[in-house]
Design a protein with these regions (language model features):
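A structural signal for short, well-ordered beta-strand elements
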Residues: 111, 198, 251, 270, ...
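Structured functional modules or segments
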Residues: 255, 266-267
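Serine-dependent protease modules
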Residues: 2-245, 254, 288, 304, ...
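PDZ-domain C-terminal substructure recognizer with occasional recognition of PDZ-binding tails
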Residues: 211-218, 260-264, 270-276, 282-317
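Acidic- and glycine-rich mobile interface elements
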Residues: 246-255, 273
């Protein structure tokens, strides 16, 4: 008689498959992850960094390199390199550094926009000084927002942040969050609580930020000069426009482009250059370098009327 149970995967088989996947990811990602030390011993920052180009460019977290000064990167094979910080962008908590003379195999870059909740992820970094550490978990949530700020008092929300239960600890910042195919889909940035870690996603927006940092050492953003938040649209307007919400202007900075365009408190911005905006993050994503000094048409709900205002953003100071 045939033992039919032999064809049914056992719990051990499932665990072996899980372990095989995590092991495979670790073997492919670990050689590209560095332990990063910045500044003077005992006074600087420490974290992780990930090689993203064959000629030694690394991505890390902006807060890891915020102390400035000299930096070094050490890898699992024992090699160590002096590192130059090329540029940092506190408003995205991303930074780019370059290991002098390094020719290390980079990680493959993935696309966080393709992630699904429940998907396996592997975190690789150097928590608490323990180099080459690997933890695994799942994508616990998508579309989270993480508040950031720079030294000039500007605040911004990093959109589409990845939430994971893969264990993250101090020192993991700047390390890799990889998918099951060993592709970099996030840069670990924050420990929000027990079993709750956050990573900046790798997507079109962050790749543009990294390219700007590699090219210019900084990120240029357009600036309107408003504070605002999401506001539901009246049903009739929502039906007419095909969107449920817009960005209500709560404050207009004196002397700003928004003030020059005659935006008022209480106005609800529903589109910019014919692109619908339903929340602050939508508006924020449109404030790119290409729009600095360019006239943009704002469609605004003012009372019961839709009006069009022209605004010319300046560079975020």
């Amino acid at each position: 008689m045939t033992d039919r149970t032999s064809t049914i995967p056992t719990e051990r088989d499932a665990l072996d498959a899980y372990s095989t996947t995590v092991t495979s990811v670790a073997e492919r990602v670990l050689p590209s992850v560095a332990s990063l030390r910045v500044g003077r011993a005992g006074r600087g920052g420490a974290g992780s960094a990930v090689v993203i180009t064959l000629d030694g460019f690394l991505v890390t977290s902006a807060h890891v390199v915020a102390q400035g000064g000299s930096a070094s990167a050490s890898f699992l094979d024992g090699t160590e390199y002096d590192v130059d910080v090329v540029g940092a962008d506190p408003l995205s908590d991303l930074a780019v550094a370059r290991a002098r003379g390094a020719t290390i195999e980079p990680v493959r870059i993935g696309n966080a926009e393709q992630l699904r909740v429940g998907q396996l992820v592997v975190a690789v970094g150097n928590p608490l000084g323990f180099s080459g550490s690997v933890t695994s978990g799942v994508v616990s949530g998508l579309g989270r927002s993480l508040a950031t700020a720079d030294g000039n008092g500007h605040r911004r929300f990093i959109e589409d942040v990845i939430q994971t239960d893969a264990a993250l600890n101090p020192g993991n910042s700047g390390g890799a969050l990889a998918d099951w195919q060993a592709r970099l889909i996030g840069v670990n940035t924050a420990v929000a609580g027990m079993g709750l870690g956050l990573a900046v996603p790798m997507n079109r927006t962050t790749e543009a930020i990294l390219s700007a940092l590699m090219r210019n050492g900084r990120v240029r953003r357009a600036y309107l000069g408003i504070a605002g938040g999401t506001r539901a649209l009246p049903p009739a307007v929502a039906q007419r426009l095909g969107q449920k919400a817009g960005v209500e202007v709560q404050e207009v900075v004196t002397g700003s482009p928004a003030a020059s365009a005659a935006l008022r408190g209480g106005d609800i911005i529903v589109s910019v250059a014919d692109v619908a905006v339903a929340k602050a993050g939508d508006l924020q994503r449109l404030m790119v370098e290409a729009h600095i000094g360019t006239k943009l048409a704002l469609s605004v709900l003012r009372g019961d009327h839709l009006v069009t205002l022209d605004v010319v953003p300046v560079e975020l100071p």
